[in-house]
Amino acid sequence: MARHSIKMIALLTAFGLASAVMTVQAAERIAFIPKLVGVGFFTSGGNGAQEAGKALGIDVTYDGPTEPSVSGQVQLVNNFVNQGYDAIIVSAVSPDGLCPALKRAMQRGVKILTWDSDTKPECRSYYINQGTPKQLGSMLVEMAAHQVDKEKAKVAFFYSSPTVTDQNQWVKEAKAKISQEHPGWEIVTTQFGYNDATKSLQTAEGIIKAYPDLDAIIAPDANALPAAAQAAENLKRNNLAIVGFSTPNVMRPYVQRGTVKEFGLWDVVQQGKISVYVANALLKNMPMNVGDSLDIPGIGKVTVSPNSEQGYHYEAKGNGIVLLPERVIFNKDNIDKYDF
């Protein structure tokens, strides 16, 4: 009888240990949130995140609001926290609107990261950053300058919204560079498409009609750039320089037809992968302070940089920026090498 009891205890203990291991494994769930679903740029980032999850044995859920709103993202964050997710990675539609929800999540032990578009740094641990505002603002102006070869020119800025963190930081730097290096360029308007394809096309056509002598549209937004290109084709404006940021799959026909000579971006699939690998490092309690590096299969080494790289004044332990290794300028010679 005693021997039978000992066996039962041993079996129950083993079952308990196995259950504990299974619980830990099941708890390693990461939510990857875009500004909104249905946009190729964000879908590609989500694909990269889920590929990394499969490689690491982590369940990565990709979900976002159907339109870019703070309330939509907050609802998703709260839902994922209540479902017991261990980490949330979000492309924030507002630098501060998500902060109360994200801080509550961190207080409950959830790891919070941002990708593509940041919050205030105190509202997350790490920002997986495609490039500093200075890098990306300069990139926009340089692409325009390759085509606008005159001292006096008229330029329009066109992107998603006046409140989104990342694009406004880039545009601020781009406008500063224009002021310093191209003082003869007049910025005639700054307008927004609000991440809506139909509204973006209408806005782009309105800009072109309102400024018939416009020389360039700078559109650092995945919806605004193709909308500007389509508007130029619709209105037969062949001599208009159109530059900005979007995905190669969306922009390929405009490049092939010569409407867009060049545009830029970064490997957003890679950005999704890096985000999940960094989140996994946090879940495994690996060292991730400023100066620490992480080797990512197929990508290489990424390093934690201080928040000051993004122009912030907030620094703390376990907090910083992870920059993508490189950015890409696409043109007719290289665009077919990319598929995202």
UniProtKB/Swiss-Prot annotation:
Gene3D superfamilies according to UniProt: 3.40.50.2300
Keyword Phosphoprotein assigned: no
GO MF annotation list: carbohydrate binding
Superkingdom assignment: Bacteria
Keyword Protein transport: no
Main localization category: periplasm
This protein's UniProt keywords: Periplasm, Signal
Localization, UniProt: Periplasm
Entry-linked Pfam families: Peripla_BP_4
One GO CC annotation: outer membrane-bounded periplasmic space
Signal peptide: 1-26
The family this protein is said to belong to: Belongs to the bacterial solute-binding protein 2 family.
Protein function: Part of the ABC transporter complex LsrABCD involved in autoinducer 2 (AI-2) import. Binds AI-2 and delivers it to the LsrC and LsrD permeases.
Subunit structure: The complex is composed of two ATP-binding proteins (LsrA), two transmembrane proteins (LsrC and LsrD) and a solute-binding protein (LsrB).
Protein name, per record: Autoinducer 2-binding protein LsrB
Provenance organism: Salmonella typhi
